[in-house]
Amino acid sequence: MSKTPRKSAASPSLQLGQAVEWPDRPEAAKLDRVPNPQKDTHFLARFTAPEFTSLCPVTGQPDFAHLVIDYVPGPWLLESKSLKLYLASFRNHGAFHEDCTVAIGKRIATEIKPKWLRIGGYWYPRGGIPIDVFWQTGKLPKDVWVPDQGVQPYRGRG
């Protein structure tokens, strides 16, 4: 049984359930939001992107990261297909690790206006040095449990 995609005031044209082209750069990517049916309840939502890629802005070589995005929703939830497309748009985007991580966190916060958001960018080593980048919007609401992001410190092959 096929359903017609629902449209909402939040995202009148959701990408979910539609054939869409992959955005070629982050600025062209659309992040969709949907109403939060539990907006009066504090809870944590987590997205994990273990195979995030972007390009070094100097060498053009690929960089790889494990991203963990935690947020306490306000009136909106982040729609996961649009997040996948947004993150994939960085594949041919040249930026330093810090810029990619913080820009992603800020863009999501702007779009969905969460009560709290944190992003951890765990970048795989280039030149022998892993870079971990963390950004958050402010104080976590007191009644929310936030588990550890679960990414072990890089230990090499040994």
UniProtKB/Swiss-Prot annotation:
Top-tier EC class: oxidoreductase
Kindly list the biological process annotations in GO that this record carries: queuosine biosynthetic process; tRNA modification
Q: In which broad location class does this protein mainly occur, judging by the first location in its UniProt entry?
A: cytoplasm
Q: Does the keyword Chaperone apply?
A: no
Q: Where is the active site?
A: C56 (thioimide intermediate), D63 (proton donor)
Q: What are the alphabetically sorted keywords of the record?
A: Cytoplasm, NADP, Oxidoreductase, Queuosine biosynthesis
A molecular-function term among this protein's GO annotations: preQ1 synthase activity
User: InterPro entries of this UniProt entry?
Assistant: GTP-CH-I_C/QueF (IPR043133), NADPH_dep_7-cyano-7-deazaG_red (IPR050084), QueF (IPR029500), QueF_type1 (IPR016856)
User: Would you say which domain of life the source belongs to?
Assistant: Bacteria
A single GO cellular-component term on record: cytoplasm
Pathway involvement?
Answer: tRNA modification; tRNA-queuosine biosynthesis
Substrates-to-products reaction catalysed: 7-aminomethyl-7-carbaguanine + 2 NADP(+) = 7-cyano-7-deazaguanine + 2 NADPH + 3 H(+)
User: Where is the protein found, in the record's own terms?
Assistant: Cytoplasm
| Chain residues that bind substrate | L78, E79, S80, H97, E98
* Keyword Transferase in annotation: no
Q: What is its EC number?
A: 1.7.1.13
What Pfam families does the database record attribute to this sequence?
QueF
Purpose of the protein: Catalyzes the NADPH-dependent reduction of 7-cyano-7-deazaguanine (preQ0) to 7-aminomethyl-7-deazaguanine (preQ1).
Record-stated family: Belongs to the GTP cyclohydrolase I family. QueF type 1 subfamily.
Provide the protein name: NADPH-dependent 7-cyano-7-deazaguanine reductase
Name the gene behind this protein. Answer: queF
